Amino acid sequence: MSYSDPNQNPIPETYAPSNSTESEKLKLYQAFIFSVPICFTFIVLFVLYVIYLRRNSTTNVDWSSLGMRGGTFVPTNNNLSTAELGLSKDIREMLPVVIYKESFIVKDSQCSVCLGDYQAEEKLQQMPSCGHTFHMECIDLWLTSHTTCPLCRLSLIPKPSLDLSHQSTEIVSSIENSNGGEASTQPDSQSATEAISHTDDVEEGNRDSQEVSKETEENDRNSVGTSDGCCTCRLG
């Protein structure tokens, strides 16, 4: 048997260091990592919301007041709806239908909407304004949201004749007539001045001829007088 010595120093108990401080630091670090992307997403959403509000505020402008101030044409709601929605079904059905044949001269050999080739005896729909042809289903779907030809973008809606053009032509014609009247009066005045100058020239010519004739008569008289004097001298 072994007996413990009471004078022997007891061995001190060693305790492992606590990991409480490290665990707290790890939790704070994890919380920071998760909070950063969340805060970033909130900031991005807030910025997008502000941009959305600004766009709505700029689009919701009183266009009628702007049109009255600027004096420009402002499209009405009916014009916008027709431009956005395209042609009605009745108008689409009124478009001419053409049967495609290889011998028949057609501008296009394939549909510009679906890029599919035309087959013989296939029904196509033709644009009356430009003459381009398309598949009936393709052009019908296109014209539900557009009012132009999908190939050349020519509008199918006829433009209304404006009275301003008629008035402008009338104004131009009246101006031309007035200018023509002035031009007709100018030759008359010129002809009158030419006639007056011609009469003056004629009168001056007559005066010159009369003076010349008088001078010739005086010369003849002088010559006759000298000849008579010579004859008397000879006779004497």
Curated annotation (Swiss-Prot):
State the residue spans of region: Disordered: 176-236
Named from the GO MF annotations, one term is: transferase activity
Listed under catalytic activity are:
S-ubiquitinyl-[E2 ubiquitin-conjugating enzyme]-L-cysteine + [acceptor protein]-L-lysine = [E2 ubiquitin-conjugating enzyme]-L-cysteine + N(6)-ubiquitinyl-[acceptor protein]-L-lysine
Q: Does the keyword Transferase apply?
A: yes
Q: Where is the composition biased (Polar residues)?
A: 176-196
Subcellular location per UniProt equals:
Membrane
Q: What is an annotated GO biological process for this record, any one? A: protein ubiquitination
Database matches in Pfam families: zf-RING_2
Query: Which SMART domains does this one have?
Result: RING
Membrane topology of the entry: Single-pass membrane protein
EC number(s) for this protein? 2.3.2.27
Q: Which UniProt keywords apply?
A: Membrane, Metal-binding, Transferase, Transmembrane, Transmembrane helix, Ubl conjugation pathway, Zinc, Zinc-finger
Recorded metabolic or biological pathway in which this protein acts: Protein modification; protein ubiquitination
Family the UniProt entry places it in: Belongs to the RING-type zinc finger family. ATL subfamily.
Official protein name in the record: RING-H2 finger protein ATL7
Q: Which organism is it from?
A: Arabidopsis thaliana
